[in-house]
Amino acid sequence: IVLMVVSVVCAFLSPWSLILGIPLILISLVVIIEPLRMSFISRPAYKALADAMPSISPTEREALDSGTSWWEKELFMGAPNWETFNSYPYPKLSLEEQAFLDNEVETLCSMLDEWEIHEQKALPDHVWQYIKEHGFLGLIIPKEYGGRAFSSFAQSRVMSKIASRSLTTAVSCMVPNSLGPGELLLHYGTEEQKNRYLPGLARGEEIPCFGLTSPEAGSDAGAIPDTGVVCYGQFEGQEVLGLRMNFSKRWITLAPIATVVGLAFKMYDPDHLLGEQTEYGITCALLPASHEGVIVGPR
């Protein structure tokens, strides 16, 4: 508006000002009048940005659309209904979960010295042994595979208690029960994979880590450059259908001692060996840490 007024005033002072001011007046009108602004500025800008953004794969769309919101939606919107929150039943521990919290967790906490762990840059061997023998790494795994099958609430209580004594130990127990491949195997693994890995994970014979974070993209799964290309290759003397992996990961918790890696990458099938689809988006593979080509850097 100010620009239009200045242009009109200058037009009375000099004809040349009018000639130069007309384009400025027209531009101002386009900016001020909403339908014109939408037609000439907003829509073209949105279209240009949309063309520049990478497309979302079906896998990524499923991840974005999965799940529902709970009471926390009201909290983030700034208008929480506390009466609704208070009406929700408070979760309770089972007798087995409470006993574990009162006994095994208390015993573990009594063994921990965070300053010693910090100075040694590692958990003491006897602490690791106790964690493995008493099922701290298999809280999420069903009992038929040797796990404890604890509820999410119980796991939260266990980790909170351990963290009050040693954050390092708590994180070491958290990863196998959250980012570890246990839950992925339960939902998507074959029976052969479940029988192969879940008992070992529950007993602590297998130590997992989850390879998501990359040096370039951080933990933004949609931006990771790591790839797996479907192809035929030689494995143990036979030609098999598999994946040729190319990845670089960083800041992977437990990686230096892990025996199995849950690896996140983007899968491609340029030769259509699996079907007509070429890009499959983000997926995961279970990879032994000792597999040829896997290089784990020092801590």
Predicted regions mapped to residue ranges:
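Short Pro/Gly-enriched beta-strand edge/turn motifs at strand-loop
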Residues: I207-L212, R244-M245, G293-G297
